[in-house]
Amino acid sequence: MLDIAPVTLPNVLGVLALFTYIVTLLPTNLRVVFPSSRRTKIPTQLLKYRRWIGILAFLIALAHAYLLVIKRSYDFLDLKTYFIYFPGLASFLILIVLTITSNQWSVKKLKKNWKRLHQLTYWAMFLLCWHIFGTMLGHGSYLTFLGIFGITLIILLYLRRRWIEAEKQKVKEQKLQA
């Protein structure tokens, strides 16, 4: 049977970091999947502040990780620790790289590579889903279910967006061949 655990501060911070991160993924996905959303100011405003929201997501994730390490006193010399927490650690490392390069100087220096580097955010999205399922399923709080719902929704939006973009590309190529 599913046991619902009490809500702890690290869990609250984890879910808050997750939803803040999801907000950074929304603008592009909304604009492609729901073209009528362009008329509203929501995607535009989210796009305008996306870097700052992403940095906030990183800082909240940092607090989440810090509190968990202190609370559970992990043995970092044990390989099982890395195996169990690999998805969370990998997504955290991706967030570190994205946060460090979320400035105009990095955009100018990295040029096309900056955009490629920031495509890692989609890997983090899948890793976070794995992290939530792997570490929380079976003993999570009600916040865990909100997190699972949120990350699943953004993954579905992303997959739909990729499908729409692939279809548009296919039509474009067919027009060029004709």
Regions inferred by a protein language model and the residue ranges of each:
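Membrane-embedded alpha-helical bundles that constitute the cytochrome b-like, heme-associated redox core
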Residues: 1-178
